[in-house]
């Protein structure tokens, strides 16, 4: 399997759904002036008003527009995971991450405020907005199962004097700062920006969610190995085949060893039927000549004498290539 995923989201229905949800829900909520229902705080929404439904929906909409754009880019980079796990398992992983991160953040929030948050200045009041918990849970899977393709080094040197000598060069080499950066640098930068945009709540919720991802992968939080979301296989399928998909599938089938073996067997059967003296006459392959060829007199000088009969699909493609 190639390390580089295909361009676009044609074969990535779950990634497409996640990106559309991340972009459309904040837009519709902003137009309808309902963005405030996705804001989650311990006081007053949970402690005073007991609006626990906010725990179920606070990850579906980012309050800040910058977080919305960053989350959409991160979902696009996560298409590696959908290609690796498959659409159905990837969707199950997202749902499990949503459930476990919500329960984990809420439970630790209650414990924190029950013992430490009695003092107002130590109370954990704000939660993260948007799908930051789900994304931080999936970061573990991305780091664990996505190989690094390339890396490069960046050296930062101090200011150089007017006259440099050999000793000065040695001193500069010792004082140089070298950074090693790999191809996951873009994802790391986006994750860092997303966490810093949300302050202390982003750091705390992000760490809890990252730990939830580790526990899901190690099997401490069950569900990923033995359970799949029911009744969604039809909706996450690729849909009706397009002209490009049919052409790619036909070309791949022609190039397989099984297809070549079938063509050779059919060619051999046709040759035996033409040279035999008894028995029924075998029908020629489509595209081959019905006139028997005298191979003994033709010899090897005739071009295409040893060329096997071409299937109909190959002839059809050759017609348009000419």
Curated annotation (Swiss-Prot):
The alphabetical list of record keywords is:
Membrane, Transmembrane, Transmembrane helix
Chain segments annotated as transmembrane:
20-40, 55-75, 91-111, 121-141, 190-210
* Segments on the Extracellular face: 1-19, 76-90, 142-189
Region annotated Disordered, chain positions: 269-322
Q: Where in the cell is it found?
A: Membrane
Subunit comment for this entry?
Answer: Component of the DSC E3 ligase complexes composed of at least TUL1, DSC2, DSC3, UBX3, CDC48 as well as VLD1 for the vacuole-localized complex or GLD1 for the Golgi/endosome-localized complex.
What this protein is called in its record is DSC E3 ubiquitin ligase complex subunit 2
Which organism is this entry from? Saccharomyces cerevisiae (strain ATCC 204508 / S288c)
